A protein has these predicted regions:
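Hydrophobic alpha-helical membrane-interaction elements
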Residues: 36-65
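Membrane-spanning helices that line or support transport/gating and their immediate boundary helices
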Residues: 61-77
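Active-site regions of oxyanion-processing enzymes, predominantly non-cytosolic
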Residues: 214, 419-453, 624
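A solvent-exposed, charged loop/short amphipathic helix patch at secondary-structure junctions
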Residues: 455-474, 642-649
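Low-complexity, glycine/alanine/valine/leucine- and proline-rich hydrophobic stretches
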Residues: 628-683
Length: 707
């Protein structure tokens, strides 16, 4: 703790000193202009006025720097006194610490099956010691929604997160639902970042009474909110380009040059000795047209595919073994007169006779983050000093590279487990430091591997027709066994004064068939295309909004083109609005896939009926509860329209949870007996507050599980 606090103080002084330097320079420039405007005796007065202002600024800066450590010390003492007062008043309570292990997407059906087979001894032991229950997820059953409810104890209508993205009502284009990032308005200004999630997380409320928390990679915590504790953000943290993850693929094969979803392909020339190309970073607003910044790199090729290549980039040299990820490589991109730092990994796929190399999305460098990815700001830097560099991208496992067959199965697994081991190192480092308070960490490994490898659980899954390597039939079973080993390590560090909670935000099911909601709406005259158009590209490019009553966007919802809400809305609020929702619900509930002879949609949920809250209107009007095996189509999710309603899902992304919430509950384990008859995601936050003897805020919709 001493090293960490010292680091905070030193970095604060450095940051403030830089700010004062810039302020002084800018002030001197302003005053210089005023002085230059005077001719004759007045110039001397103007000069001395400027001199005294600069002198006063210098002494003010000196005083602030001298007193800064005292201010930090006073704040630390105040927090310590508040912290000690709380635990003195509650010394009789059993719970001193709450540890939360989040395993995104851990499925109850698989968990129960593997426990019965004796494959998960630590989960079985935790169940016997305390409790196990299925955990009711949110509607819709999507990670940003569920984890927001976990943090706040609120339903979506009160925390305002209904999906990964929503629509801009003025343009019908997609926008991130959880964060608003605006580009700098000038060369000296930084991007403006604003969280769109409403409500307060339980760790913020605990911090009010001096109870500190360490929160690692809980989704939808970007940008980080100030509170009494430490936090590393996760889902929705962008890459250095400002996207949610853009990989690069370099190839000498013309046949591999394709338009890749989630990445960019670059042609290189293999002359047998070296490959030369560029890495592309953030836009440079100082140049005309704001082109992407770029830095050169070279790969010195080996004589055979089994030898190491040499990577030369940013004055650094790395040996690249074939099909083995490089360590994190630090990059510096020139943007104007500044440098912006990122990190990435390189993976040589082939060198002879053709060259192929994959590069991960360029993550924000945790040692020098261009955006706030942690609280305090220096916490990300501190972790990088403790454990070297690490993934900072919110969605760090590159599912699209596997979908596009740039990576093979092993390449994806290697990347995923590299990220997982980083997370384990962070988690256990923080766990050893947090003796009282909360330590929570969410692992994405369970979610990502099930998404991409579910097809191996089903011999007849349509995705097998699109390729993929054999031999991965046990991948998901091994995943669950690895999580059991993680739990075993964790349980050895849990004492009698620690409440241990292990949970997932949702379960998993097969994704075999795609449902194009927009095509169904088009074929049934709820969505209308422009004159002469038979289909539409992404983001409703050919949609005639003056005649469209309903449209689908995102992973789970249908929006009504409501007059007075959407920019070109035509459906009247009130009776017409309610009648249209009822009509769509009746026609889509029980919708049958005639080619397969099964129901594709179990139920349609009217948001205004299932939720009560001030932000109901920010979500979709109707949430679609898909049957097992079905999900919204890839095209429909991004606003495309064609004439096909049902089609096979051929992508490696073969498992999903964006279904009827009733069939994809999560799991809940804890080392104490539950008193509640059932458990919901919204119950976790109030449960943690009650364990520390705090009153649950009236705004929270969840209930404590041990009361």
């Amino acid at each position: 703790m001493v090293h960490y606090n010292n680091m905070i103080m030193v970095n604060r002084v450095k940051i403030f000193s830089r700010w004062l330097t810039v302020a002084a320079v800018l002030l001197s420039l302003v005053q210089a202009k005023e002085a230059a405007a005077y001719i004759g005796p007045g110039a001397g007065i103007a000069f001395f006025s400027s001199f005294f202002i600069l002198l006063a600024t210098f002494f003010l800066a000196l005083l602030i720097i001298l007193f800064w450590p005292i201010r930090v010390l006073i704040q630390a003492i105040k927090h310590r006194l508040k912290y000690q007062k709380y635990f003195d008043q509650n010394s009789h309570r059993k719970t001193k610490r709450v540890v939360i292990l989040g395993l995104d997407g851990m499925d109850p059906d698989l968990t129960e099956r593997f426990m019965q087979q004796g494959l998960l001894p630590n989960f079985s032991a935790l169940k016997e010691e305390g409790s196990y229950s299925r955990l009711q997820t949110t509607c819709p059953a999507i990670s940003p929604v569920a984890w927001s409810s976990f943090a706040t104890g609120l339903t979506p209508a009160r925390h305002a997160i209904f999906d990964f993205f929503t629509r801009d009502r003025s343009t019908y284009l997609p926008i991130l639902s959880s964060v608003d990032i605006q580009k700098p308005t000038g060369r000296l200004k930084k991007p403006k970042i604003k969280s769109l999630k409403k409500g307060r997380a339980f760790w913020e409320i605990l911090g009010d009474v001096g109870i500190s928390s360490s929160i690692l990679r809980v989704p939808v915590t970007f940008p980080p909110v100030k509170f009494s504790g430490r936090l590393l953000s996760a889902m929705c943290v962008p890459d250095l380009k400002g996207t949610q993850g853009t990989f690069s693929f370099y190839t000498s094969r013309d046949s591999r040059l394709q338009q890749c979803t989630g990445g960019t392909c670059f042609k290189v020339v293999n002359r047998g000795e070296k490959i030369s190309s560029f890495l592309y970073g953030p836009e440079d607003p100082s140049k005309k047209g704001a082109p992407e910044s770029k830095i050169p790199f070279e790969v010195i090729l080996p004589k055979t595919n089994s030898d190491c290549a040499q990577l030369l980039v940013c004055g650094q040299k790395f040996l690249l073994k074939p099909r083995e990820y490089s360590p994190w490589v630090r990059l510096s991109f020139p943007v104007g007169r500044k440098k912006v730092y990122g990190v990435c990994r390189f993976l040589i796929l082939e060198t002879n006779p053709d060259f192929e190399m994959y590069v991960t999305p360029i993550n924000i460098d945790p040692e020098n983050p261009v955006l706030p990815i942690s609280h305090p700001f220096v916490y990300a830097m501190y972790l990088a000093k403790v454990m070297n560099s690490y993934a900072t991208l919110g969605l760090a496992e590159d599912t699209w590279a596997l979908n596009e067959r740039i990576l093979d199965e092993q390449g994806f697994l290697d990347q995923t487990y590299l990220n997982h081991h980083e997370r384990e190192q962070m988690f256990f480092h923080e766990l050893d430091k947090v003796r009282r308070g909360v330590c929570a960490c969410v692992f994405d490994t369970t979610d990502r591997i099930q998404h991409m490898f579910w097809r191996y659980l089903e011999k007849d899954h349509p995705a097998h027709r699109a390729g993929g390597e054999p031999g991965y039939e046990k991948t998901i079973e091994e995943l669950y066994k690895n999580m059991d080993e993680l739990l075993g390590r964790l349980r050895r560090k849990i004492d009698e004064h620690t409440l241990l909670i292990v949970l997932s935000d949702h379960g998993f099911k097969s994704f075999r068939r795609c449902v194009s909601l927009n095509s169904w709406l088009y074929l049934n005259n709820y969505l209308v295309l422009k004159e002469g158009a038979k289909e539409s590209g992404e983001w409703f490019a050919q949609v005639d909004w003056s005649r469209t009553r309903a449209y689908a966007l995102g992973l789970g919802g249908i929006f009504i083109n409501l007059k007075g809400r959407e920019a070109q809305g035509i459906v009247q609020p009130g009776a017409e609005f309610d009648r249209l929702k009822g009509e769509l619900s009746a026609r889509l509930s029980g919708l049958k896939d005639e080619a397969k002879g099964v129901v594709a949609i179990n139920q349609i949920y009217d948001c205004q009926r299932i939720y009560q809250g001030p932000y109901t209107d920010m979500g979709p009007d109707l949430i679609v509860g898909y049957a097992e095996g079905y999900r919204i189509s890839w095209d429909s999710a991004v606003g495309k329209v064609n004439g096909t309603v049902f089609e096979d899902n051929l992508k490696s992304w073969s498992g999903d949870h964006c279904l009827d919430p009733k069939i994809v509950p999560g799991v809940l384990f804890c080392n104490r007996k539950l008193k509640a008859a059932s458990a919901r995601m919204i119950d976790i936050a109030p449960t943690v507050l009650r364990e520390f003897n705090l009153n649950v805020p009236p705004s929270m919709e969840g209930k404590p599980l041990f009361d």
